[in-house]
Amino acid sequence: MSYSALEAAIEAAWEARDTITPATKGEARDAVEATLEALDKGSLRVAEKRGADWHVNQWAKKAVLLGFRLKDMDVQTGGPQGGTWWDKVDSKFAQWGEAQWKAAGFRAVPNCIVRRSAYIAKGVVLMPSFVNLGAYVDEGTMVDTWATVGSCAQIGKNVHLSGGVGIGGVLEPMQAGPTIIEDNCFIGARSEVVEGCIVREGSVLGMGVFIGKSTKIVDRETGEVMYGEVPAGSVVVAGSMPSKGGVNLYCAVIVKRVDAQTRSKTSINELLRD
């Protein structure tokens, strides 16, 4: 099916979603499975950049959700000491052998988890981390230890997600658009970007920066307050602003624009990508 045909079939299935079960056959099942396969291969994305703006393929997100209704829970093996798990989403790596790994071209350290329908591009390094379904991780990115890439999140090229970073998903609670980290960004340890916020290209978030839709993002130089988006080339740290009753509330502060000194501290190490 073409993408336009898939979209029409997914939208029809979504309207009848209460009737969809693991026993469902026909066009609805075929469309959902084809969409999940396209997401898994990276030929389709939940969100794609068109010029300076991001376009969200809402129907692809709906297909991810419909996939939960089409599959029964089953035992997944491979746990410590012969343990198992109980889930309805397969691993991206299920049944992979040497040929599939070589063709994929990324590195996956033991104990990383990637669920089927997430795309991982060539040159990516996955430390013991979690990448949820529908996500897209582009070339040369490092997903460091205990980092989480949420459902349908979009991670650009040559991004570094430091240890314990959380990139929010869109499925629960439902968000209109995915969280997006554009190319060449560095996200410091234990930082969180959630609720469909966008970190624009080349930005650096220091350790422990938390950004959601209601987080004030303050430009220290101009005093401008913005929400939901970090401008390109920003260096951002955690801060606070005065509020009612003499209490300071958390905010994220743009302290400067990325310069040569910042790049030298946050550049990726090509030796780790070989």
Curated annotation (Swiss-Prot):
Pathway: Amino-acid biosynthesis; L-lysine biosynthesis via DAP pathway; LL-2,6-diaminopimelate from (S)-tetrahydrodipicolinate (succinylase route): step 1/3. InterPro entries: DapD_Trfase_Hexpep_rpt_fam (IPR005664), Hexapep (IPR001451), Hexapep_transf_CS (IPR018357), THP_succinylTrfase_dom1 (IPR023180), THP_succinylTrfase_N_sf (IPR037133), Trimer_LpxA-like_sf (IPR011004). One of its GO terms (molecular function) is 2,3,4,5-tetrahydropyridine-2,6-dicarboxylate N-succinyltransferase activity. Keywords: Acyltransferase, Amino-acid biosynthesis, Cytoplasm, Diaminopimelate biosynthesis, Lysine biosynthesis, Repeat, Transferase. CDD domains: LbH_THP_succinylT (cd03350). It is an enzyme of class 2 (transferase). Pfam families: Hexapep_2 (PF14602), THDPS_N_2 (PF14805). It catalyses: (S)-2,3,4,5-tetrahydrodipicolinate + succinyl-CoA + H2O = (S)-2-succinylamino-6-oxoheptanedioate + CoA. Substrate binds at R107, D144. Gene3D superfamilies: Hexapeptide repeat proteins, Tetrahydrodipicolinate-N-succinyltransferase, N-terminal domain. One of its GO terms (cellular component) is cytoplasm. Its EC number is 2.3.1.117. GO terms for biological process: diaminopimelate biosynthetic process; lysine biosynthetic process via diaminopimelate. It comes from the Bacteria. It is found in: Cytoplasm. Belongs to the transferase hexapeptide repeat family. HAMAP family: DapD. Homotrimer. This is 2,3,4,5-tetrahydropyridine-2,6-dicarboxylate N-succinyltransferase. It comes from Cereibacter sphaeroides (strain ATCC 17025 / ATH 2.4.3) (Rhodobacter sphaeroides).
